[in-house]
Design a protein with these regions (language model features):
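A generic "structured core" feature
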Residues: 35, 73, 77, 93-101, ...
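Acidic, glycine-centered active-site loop in nucleotide-sugar glycosyltransferases
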Residues: 107-108, 113-116
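Flexible, glycine/small-residue-enriched loop-and-beta-strand segment within the central core
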Residues: 3-89, 115-117, 121-124
Length: 124
């Protein structure tokens, strides 16, 4: 289920597993693939970014965009307002706290919160 409004760049780069729920007002920039595992819940206002731009300002002037895939495992819960940055992998059975900014991979069975998101505990 995807609740409107929903925003994406292309749509063809988004892969959803069975029984995925995407709440309202989410933005998925899918220049690279976005893969969301089965039974995952995405809260409202979540943003998933695959595009990455060079840090060097001269290179950034070139009309190029690089994209790195974002992967979310099965049975995850991504809290409202979370931001997932290019190239991150979130393992299976993870919880990402509301408003968190995920800049690095999160291992299976983790609860991660904050900006940048850090693992604060494991879940069974």
């Amino acid at each position: 289920v995807i609740c409107p409004p929903f925003y994406c760049d292309h749509g063809h780069g988004i892969r959803l597993g069975e029984h995925v729920f995407v709440n309202a007002n989410c933005t998925f920039l899918d220049g690279g693939y976005i893969t969301i595992g089965a039974h995952t819940l995405i809260g409202p206002n979540v943003q998933i970014y695959t595009p990455h731009h060079p840090v060097d300002y001269i290179t950034r002037r070139e009309p190029k965009e690089y994209a790195y895939p974002v992967t979310i495992g099965e049975d995850c819960w991504i809290g409202g307002g979370a931001i997932l940055c290019p190239g991150v992998k979130i393992g299976h059975r993870c919880i990402i706290g509301a408003g968190s900014v995920v800049t690095k991979d999160i291992p299976d069975n983790s609860v991660a919160v904050g900006n940048p998101a850090k693992v604060i505990r494991k879940v069974d």
